[in-house]
Curated annotation (Swiss-Prot):
UniProt KW 4Fe-4S keyword: yes
Residues binding isopentenyl diphosphate: H40, H72, H122, S216, N218, S259
E.C. number: 1.17.7.4
TM annotation in the entry: none
Cross-referenced PANTHER family: 4-HYDROXY-3-METHYLBUT-2-ENYL DIPHOSPHATE REDUCTASE (PTHR30426:SF0)
Function: Catalyzes the conversion of 1-hydroxy-2-methyl-2-(E)-butenyl 4-diphosphate (HMBPP) into a mixture of isopentenyl diphosphate (IPP) and dimethylallyl diphosphate (DMAPP). Acts in the terminal step of the DOXP/MEP pathway for isoprenoid precursor biosynthesis.
Name the UniProt record assigns to this protein: 4-hydroxy-3-methylbut-2-enyl diphosphate reductase
Binding, [4Fe-4S] cluster: C12, C94, C188
Binding site for dimethylallyl diphosphate: H40, H72, H122, S216, N218, S259
Cofactor: how and how many bound: Binds 1 [4Fe-4S] cluster per subunit.
Binding sites annotated in the UniProt record for (2E)-4-hydroxy-3-methylbut-2-enyl diphosphate: H40, H72, H122, T160, S216, N218, S259
Species the sequence originates in: Dictyoglomus thermophilum (strain ATCC 35947 / DSM 3960 / H-6-12)
Cofactors, names only: [4Fe-4S] cluster
Similarity remark: Belongs to the IspH family.
Length: 283
């Protein structure tokens, strides 16, 4: 069996920074809560939980504690609320997400109708929307675009894990809705790179394994890209892998979402090694 592993794999830089900050705060504070799941990967959340990092779910109430803003960010009002309760709030928002928040706030203050291309219910998008005083428009599909009125000034930003192809299609449809339109490409470069690697893998292999959380937006998009071309399996844990999927003469591809730990890749590689002799290539 020949195995092609798409690079980069494992955590993106934003996830690394968020986890590093959480562990540092835990070391200094002793007791720590994250405001929602820090990242969208159950394996990572389980490991953080074992270390003592707890999750404060939506509408949870604590006072005088150390709290960490999740990598996807939070609405401004939530952060302000927890601070009024005497909590020490540490911001682990991905720097690229923070950039989108700042841009959305800038555009809103300068009288642009802010359009966020992304998923309405994704925590990142909900957070960005708050920086427009909740006056922005979230575009998830073409029906959302049809509802947009004509505005003199429109500013467009993107959920950082959007696929570039999907985003460009929507931008083209929005162009006729405003006289002045400013577009900021806020899609994460690592997300774009992994999408391109998914396309490349689809031309090289017989089947693909997409490793990452089922609740991870960027991982789902990798799965969608690959599954259009070849048999593809979205794997969250090793128990989901069925050995009957593989044959000795297979060319198999592995690609990971941006919050998938390296050790999960290694775990899957070891499983494949136990099935057939394995020739490994990085692509």
């Amino acid at each position: 069996m020949i195995l092609y592993i798409a690079t980069p794999y494992g955590f993106c830089s934003g996830v690394k920074k968020s986890i590093s900050l959480a562990e540092k705060v835990l070391s200094n504070e002793g007791e720590v809560y994250t405001l929602g799941a820090l990242v969208h990967n159950p394996k990572v959340i389980e490991e953080l939980s074992k270390k003592g990092i707890k999750i404060l779910e939506k509408n949870g109430f604590v006072e005088g504690k150390a709290l960490i803003v999740r990598a996807h960010g939070l609405p401004q009002r939530d952060i302000e609320f927890y601070r009024t309760l005497g909590n020490r709030v540490y911001d682990a928002t991905c720097p690229l997400v923070k950039k989108v928040q700042i841009l959305a706030e800038y555009l809103n203050k300068n009288k642009y109708k802010v359009v966020i291309i992304g998923e309405k219910n994704h925590p990142e998008v909900i957070g960005i929307l708050s920086y427009t005083d909740d006056q922005g428009i979230v575009v998830e599909n073409e029906d959302d675009i049809k509802k947009i009125e004509n505005y003199p000034k429109i500013g467009i930003v993107f959920q950082t894990t959007q696929s570039l192809d999907n985003a460009l299609q929507k931008v083209n449809l929005i162009m006729e809705k405003g006289k002045e339109i400013r577009i900021f490409n806020t899609i994460c470069p690592e997300t774009i790179e992994r999408q391109e690697k998914a396309k490349k893998l689809s031309e090289m292999v017989d089947l693909a394994l997409v490793l990452g959380g089922k609740n991870s937006a960027n991982t789902r998009r990798l799965y969608i890209t690959l599954s259009k071309k070849i048999p593809t399996y979205h794997i969250e844990n090793i128990e989901e892998i069925d050995k009957s999927w593989f044959k000795e003469d297979n060319k198999v591809g592995i690609i990971t979402g941006t919050s998938t730990p390296n050790d999960f890749v290694e775990e899957v590689v070891e499983l494949l090694k136990s099935l057939y002799p394995l020739e490994i290539h990085l692509v």
